[in-house]
Amino acid sequence: MHWISGRCQFYRFQKPVDERFPVMLELFCRAPDGIKLAEGSHLTPIPLDEAVASLSAILLDDEYYAFIMAGRRESDGLPWVGEDRLIPLKASAWVDLNTRQAKGEAVDAKNIRKHANDVLRLSQLLAPEVRIPLAARIGDDLNRFLDGLTADRSIDPKSLKLNNTVAEIVRRIAQAYELKRAGTQ
């Protein structure tokens, strides 16, 4: 609560002036007992008061939550996750938004493209030797994303200042996450 106006005031922490601070904060939690996820869902919007609607939090099912927690790192007592965890989350959000759009729901195409672009950028941070095991369903979601990425001829890594082709990025992600795909080991 703002001490002068008496109104609630919320802040998004993005693009800090001091480079020692993270670029963005996301909150992750697993579903509490009182919230029932729709069958087959793993990302679920939570109805909130309009005052906090601009804040970012992601409710995860147990499988995704365990995946995040298994890769959690810590710096100065603050837990965080890196590209190895964010890539499957962004890919899953992309799959979810595309599915919802295909069903006729109003989905902003910019959000779909943002998740794809985020995965492309984050994939550049994966060290060549890194291998990240995935639960079967998370692997299936990531494979669906990679299929969609391959099929989308409008995706241009060069517009993101990346020197790889879509095919190279798909191969690198599949290799890192040990996914079974045509043309990979």
Language-model regions, residue ranges each:
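Compositionally biased terminal segments of proteins
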Residues: 1-185
